A protein has these predicted regions:
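Catalytic beta/alpha-barrel core
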Residues: 105-106, 176-178
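Acidic/histidine-rich catalytic cores of soluble enzymes
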Residues: 141, 163-177
Length: 178
């Protein structure tokens, strides 16, 4: 018997067929989001395979739209993780998605939520990542109601203050945010 949390077995044919079905309806696909961010059994290596296979399939579908999650889920949050570690982790995933020809959805980072000491750390990380991407990205920010490990994201437990920090980053990099 397989443990789906430890022994991931993806039915690639059905997975890609479902993406093709979504594209046939005129819908876009946000790829490798739940799997990469929420720990649903697919690690970063598996997420890369999913992104690659979906991008390959997308190229055969006129008008298909897809963006792929890039985050830091391969970096385990911990007391020794620094903001620089988070930057390197984001860069690794962003570079991988771009190297495959994909568009990026920049996911919130549990490691950043733990390593950051205030809004300035978020500004530092997002400035660096947004300055390095080739094409505009979608910034994806889940609140703590979806992931308690993201409490205080953007350097504040007050959502209005957090949004001000996020909006300042977006404004500073308007050409890099979709």
């Amino acid at each position: 018997e397989q443990d789906p949390w430890l022994d991931v077995a993806v039915d690639w044919d059905r997975t890609i067929a479902y993406r093709r079905y979504l594209w046939s309806l005129g819908l876009g696909v946000a790829e490798a989001m739940d799997t990469a961010q929420r720990g649903m059994g697919l690690d970063w290596t598996g997420a890369q395979e999913l992104i690659r296979r979906s991008l390959d399939a997308m190229r055969d579908v006129p008008g298909a739209v897809m963006a792929s999650g890039a985050g830091t889920d391969h970096l385990a949050p911990g007391p020794d993780v620094t903001v620089d570690d988070v930057i390197r982790a984001y860069e690794e995933q962003c570079e991988a998605v771009e190297a495959m020809g994909g568009r990026i959805i920049l996911m919130a980072s549990r490691a950043l939520a733990r390593a950051a000491r205030g809004p300035e750390d978020y500004v530092c990380v997002y400035d660096r990542i947004l300055s390095g991407v080739r094409e505009p990205v979608i910034i994806h920010w889940l609140g703590e109601m979806f992931d308690p490990a993201l409490e205080g994201y953007w350097g504040s437990g007050d959502h209005t203050q957090a949004m001000e920090t996020a909006l300042a980053v977006i404004h500073a990099h308007a050409d890099k945010v979709d």
